[in-house]
Curated annotation (Swiss-Prot):
Species whose genome carries this gene: Homo sapiens
Record protein name field: Protein cornichon homolog 4
Location of the protein in the cell: Membrane; Endoplasmic reticulum; Endoplasmic reticulum-Golgi intermediate compartment
InterPro entries from the UniProt entry: Cornichon
Gene Ontology terms: cellular component: COPII-coated ER to Golgi transport vesicle; endoplasmic reticulum; endoplasmic reticulum membrane; endoplasmic reticulum-Golgi intermediate compartment
Amino acid sequence: MEAVVFVFSLLDCCALIFLSVYFIITLSDLECDYINARSCCSKLNKWVIPELIGHTIVTVLLLMSLHWFIFLLNLPVATWNIYRYIMVPSGNMGVFDPTEIHNRGQLKSHMKEAMIKLGFHLLCFFMYLYSMILALIND
């Protein structure tokens, strides 16, 4: 059972890594004016809920399988994703709003957040890979 948890976590982490890279590429395209703010934000807002669900499922799965250290490592990022989604003002298009993305350095903060998430998911990828190999050897 432990190996199945880490295989699923590893696959989910791969998807989240690709999603983080997609966020970085799309935000850098907006920064360089290759795409407009409306199309950038609509592309990114499509993937906010799948990212939220994917990370939350892995976090809950780690809690249920009693992997406390990895659960506690994932908990702040999952909490931040939920908080960011809940705190979207009612008039905004989503987490990424085209009317406000160039205001108050939001583009830079979104880019920094995407980079931090990419580093976090890469760290988790190798942790899950190590744990999966260890679980397969012990079975």
